[in-house]
Amino acid sequence: FSNCSALTGIEIPVNVVNIGRTAFESCSALASIIVDEGNTVYDSRGNCNALIETVTNTLMRGCDNTIIPDDVTVINGFAFNRCSGLTSIRIPASVTKIAIDAFHRCIGLTSIIVDEGNTVYDSRGNCNALIETATNRLIIGCNNTIIPDDVTSISDYAFYGCNAFESIIIPSGVTTIGQNAFEECISLESIELPESTTFSMLRPVMATLRPYLAL
């Protein structure tokens, strides 16, 4: 169903036992995911509007209306790819692994909240970003992100498709900016950089920034 942009809902029957990672990639209008209660491999527990692998508690695919259940432990790559109607997401304390491309091109995302009990990730200071706590690495940002002062690196594709924000301030503690961190940030007009910024630090993102900024 990749790129079925008009698909609004999907029902997974009891006999389905194998679903590919990108089966519902770029289904930008998807708002409802229901798995038959008799299915022994997948579920959509608690009417969460998500496809979950039951044994591993892995969220395989979400949609605009997904509420991540409290017992999910992993969020797969491209799980929310192009969920353009997704405006906010809450990461439960149980989640210990999130792929860096899990929220690619979620152009409407304005709020990211991580439960305070999560020991792997946080959204410190209401920053509206997903941060890996141990490394102070910003993994996923959104249109309302304010990068905390203690962040030291920005992941590849961290702000991919955040097309509404016009400016961003990079704190002085940031020493690494990943490849394509600001890809498709079409409204971005200014980036405030610390004095410590070096050309080698900016090199990975120069190509993607050039269409939007006067560099």
Show which residues each predicted segment covers.
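Structural signature of tandem-repeat unit edges
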Residues: 4-18, 28-49, 55-74, 83-97, ...
